[in-house]
Structures are given as structure tokens and as C-alpha cells.
């Protein structure tokens, strides 16, 4: 059998048949890019040891369109997204699993580019992809490639973060500017040109999280504001904890190109997706220390205290506007920007 044509070839139904062609796809494309001691064993599962602590598991499916964008692609995004979900528990991400749904006819050159990007992101994060699966669907029944990743990590003993732990008086911190990812994807998808000045913020945040929890283990909760953006995520946390939140608009980091793009498109940046930012809630007396630690890290240089947790049985999130008024930051109704991740 000749080698895969990674320049001009495409995915065929036989690549999902479980036979020789599938083995060739796995060996010459997936295993070569993602190679590590677990994948080299060739098993249908991975066996590994974990350090002491509570085990955390998270899974995330990625259907983003377009597949490639300034600042990343579906491969790196699949790694970053699941690592971040694990890290938001205060955990150290240890291992990843990946499942691919491929559409018949998808160019092998694009698939190789995606898998190599995934491998590079995993290496940079120090979190290997140790097992995986591939399926092929008929032409027209997919959209190129969908990726599901599952991550396993460990929370150090004595640390407990959860979305139901926010208390009145706590401070709300944000690690950086919002809306970059969502505006980048929408601009590229619609051919608007904003992506020339804006790129996705997709990145793995476990290094920032490790620095934060080491310095301030009293952190109540962490959450990454992905789909639905900052507004939806804060409503989720308010509902989980049975509290309200009071935000200050002028304190929320927002880059000028993103602000201008949202204004042009009629979007509220509070609801635009992010892929490399986190929200932290901590006791008021720890907020300045936590802010200092975040700003010392490359991924938190734009960090800010953006609000306060308040007692509110209705769990409303409200915001003091730039003009001194007040507005409700409600749950997002409908889908403002589909297929952002």
C-alpha cells in the first residue's frame, strides 16, 4: 500500500472501516504527530498513574466554523478548551483523549494541519493526548471535522473550587479583555476584515490558574467565559451560588478594535465568546493580592476587579454603566453567535 497523499489526498469512507486504510491513517497522520509513550503502545485505551488528590474530568466537543482562524484552529482550540475546563477546578491537567468525526472528502492536508496544531498545543501545555478514536461519515453529513476532547486532571489536596461557593461581599476578577475570539470568528466567517486587527485569544490557562491558587488558595471559584461570554457565565455563577452580582462597566477590559467591531455589528461584547480568559471570585480581603498575582503572569496582565457579589435572592446580575446608570445583564436569549467553539 502506498503512503497517504497528505498533499492532494482526501478522507475516504474506507479510512473509517477499521481495516488497513484506517490503520494507515492513524499511523501516518495521527500517531506520527501526537506520538508519545501511551499512543506508541497501540492500545484502545491508555493506562497511567495520577498524583495524589481529587480527580477531575471534563469533556468538550468542538464544531467551530471556520476551522482555521487568526490565533488558532479547531485543533489547538480542542486542546485549550478542555484543558481550561479541567483547570477551572484548580486542577493540574494531566492527560487528554481525542475523538474525531471526519467527513468524506475532507482534504488530508487540512487534517494533517489540524492534528499537527493539536500536537503542538498539547506539547506546549505539557498535557499529552494519550488515546483517541476516529470515525468517518458520508459526504454532506458532516462539516469537515468535529473534535471531542476529554481531559483528566488532579486537584491538590486541601483545595476546593466550585461555582456554588460565591458569597456576598466577594470580589469578581477577570483575567483580561473580552470578545476577541468571537469577533475574530464572526469577522472571518462573514468576510468583514476585522480579524486583521483582532485574533482569537485561544490559550491554555492552567499555568495562570496554578499561580493563582498557590498564592490565594481561598479563591471561591473559577470559570472561563466561553459560549455566551462574560454575561452568561456570570449569570450561571450567580444562579449556582444563589447570589446577585454588581459589575462596573468601566472596569471591564475591552480592546478598542473589539469595541468598534461590536458597535458596527450591533453586538454586546458581554455576550461574545472568549477562549483564553477566566473569571475568579474570591473574598474581598484577598482580591488585591490575587489581582497582583494575575497581573504578574503573562496571561493576566490586563486583569481587573470588575465587580462585587451581593445578596440577591433573585440572582440578578446588574452593571453600573459608563454613564452612571444601571442596566440588567440578563441571560442571553437565543444564539448571538453560533459555532464559536
UniProtKB/Swiss-Prot annotation:
One of its GO terms (biological process) is protein maturation. InterPro entries: HypE (IPR011854), PurM-like_C_dom (IPR010918), PurM-like_C_sf (IPR036676), PurM-like_N (IPR016188), PurM-like_N_sf (IPR036921). It comes from the Bacteria. SUPFAM superfamilies: PurM C-terminal domain-like (SSF56042), PurM N-terminal domain-like (SSF55326). Pfam families: AIRS, AIRS_C. May be involved in the maturation of the NifE hydrogenase. Belongs to the HypE family. This is Hydrogenase expression/formation protein HupE.
